[in-house]
């Protein structure tokens, strides 16, 4: 399961094109990691 998809409430719910951006915004929103 990739973090870019809503699969679990702690996963990244943002579609990301760059892993660093995804990780940054996801961790700010409480995810453990936001990498796709």
Curated annotation (Swiss-Prot):
It comes from the Eukaryota. Disulfide bonds join 16-36. The keyword Iron-sulfur does not apply. Its main location: secreted. Gene3D superfamilies: Knottin, scorpion toxin-like. It is found in: Secreted. Keywords: Disulfide bond, Ion channel impairing toxin, Neurotoxin, Secreted, Toxin, Voltage-gated sodium channel impairing toxin. Pfam families: Toxin_3. Residues 2-36 form the LCN-type CS-alpha/beta domain. PROSITE patterns: LCN_CSAB. Coiled coil: none annotated. GO terms for cellular component: extracellular region. Expressed by the venom gland. One of its GO terms (molecular function) is toxin activity. Has the structural arrangement of an alpha-helix connected to antiparallel beta-sheets by disulfide bonds (CS-alpha/beta). Binds to sodium channels (Nav) and inhibits the inactivation of the activated channels, thereby blocking neuronal transmission. Belongs to the long (4 C-C) scorpion toxin superfamily. Sodium channel inhibitor family. Alpha subfamily. This is Neurotoxin 8. The lineage of its organism: Eukaryota, Metazoa, Ecdysozoa, Arthropoda, Chelicerata.
